[in-house]
A protein has these predicted regions:
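Short aromatic-glycine-(Arg/Gly/Cys) micro-motifs in beta-strand/loop hairpins
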Residues: 1-20
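Intrinsic disorder/low-complexity segments, especially N-terminal tails and targeting/processing regions
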Residues: 8-9, 25, 48
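A short, exposed loop/beta-hairpin motif centered on an aromatic-Gly-Thr core
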Residues: 15-28, 37, 43
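Short, mixed-charge low-complexity intrinsically disordered segments
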Residues: 31-63
Length: 63
């Protein structure tokens, strides 16, 4: 089973940030949630919840 989460960035920013700590079991549910929740000038990306992505986006202190 794969799990997913949503990250976002302002269109003028370079790096994505964690949007919410909600985990989804279906990629399309994560994308739908992100689209409904985002402001206009933001981009979203749905990522697989794995060790690499967790370390990159969830551990804000390490960035």
């Amino acid at each position: 089973m794969m799990l997913y989460f949503v990250v976002f960035k302002n269109k003028k920013d370079k790096e994505y940030k964690l949007f919410t700590n909600t985990i989804f079991d279906k990629e399309n549910e994560a994308e739908e949630f992100g689209k409904k929740s985002m402001k206009r000038n933001y981009e979203l990306k749905v990522l697989e919840y794995n060790k690499e992505n967790h370390n990159r986006y969830w551990n804000e202190k390490d960035r």
